[in-house]
């Protein structure tokens, strides 16, 4: 019937907006992760070749999924200021798939990547992507690209808090 897909309450709207990692998402630091799966081993090897440490994997909650288009991708979750998942991206490890990054269906301008770790009163380092972010010291976030829009939540918070910023973009930006 025509109206059967309409939302019946405000709680339903919130559920629809909730961001969820892939159902089989597993953290690399989870002892139960299936390291016997060759694709999971390849993702782990890729991370190690990129210079990621076990501490990085724990701190940034790197994970993996073997279903829903995320096979052979490292998944980077992001959390808002309250610790709720607000975004995730899955980076292809082979370099031959399009898109290179498979993102959650979220408007990137309406979230701040890993805001949970940001102190708006201190200098904030802005980098392009999650791998760049891992190599930063404390108080950094990534743009998920090379552009900061004036109407993005990140830009508005920087202005609101008068946060000093340090740009560390790739040479091709």
Regions found by a protein language model. Name each.
Residues 67-163:
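Phosphate-handling DNA/RNA-contact segment within nucleic-acid enzymes
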Residues 1-55, 59-64, 68-73, 84-85, ...:
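Non-catalytic accessory segments of DNA primases and related replication-initiation nucleases
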Residues 148-149, 169-173:
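Acidic, metal-coordinating catalytic cores used for nucleic-acid/nucleotide bond scission
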């Amino acid at each position: 019937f025509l109206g059967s897909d309409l939302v019946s309450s405000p709680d339903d709207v919130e559920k629809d907006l909730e961001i969820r990692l892939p159902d089989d998402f597993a953290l690399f630091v989870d002892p139960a992760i299936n390291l016997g799966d060759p694709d999971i081993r390849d993702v782990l090897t890729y991370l190690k070749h990129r210079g990621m440490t076990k501490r990085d994997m724990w701190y940034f909650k790197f994970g993996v999924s073997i279903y829903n288009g995320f096979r052979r991708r490292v998944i980077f979750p992001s959390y808002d200021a309250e610790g709720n998942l607000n975004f995730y991206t899955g980076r292809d490890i082979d370099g031959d798939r399009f898109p290179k990054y498979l993102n959650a269906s979220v408007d990137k301008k309406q979230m701040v990547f890993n805001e949970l770790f940001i102190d708006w009163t201190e200098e904030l380092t802005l980098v392009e992507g999650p791998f760049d972010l891992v190599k930063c010291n404390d108080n950094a976030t990534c743009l998920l690209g090379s552009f900061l829009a004036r109407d993005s939540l990140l830009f508005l918070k920087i202005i609101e808090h008068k946060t000093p910023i340090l740009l560390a973009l790739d040479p091709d930006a």
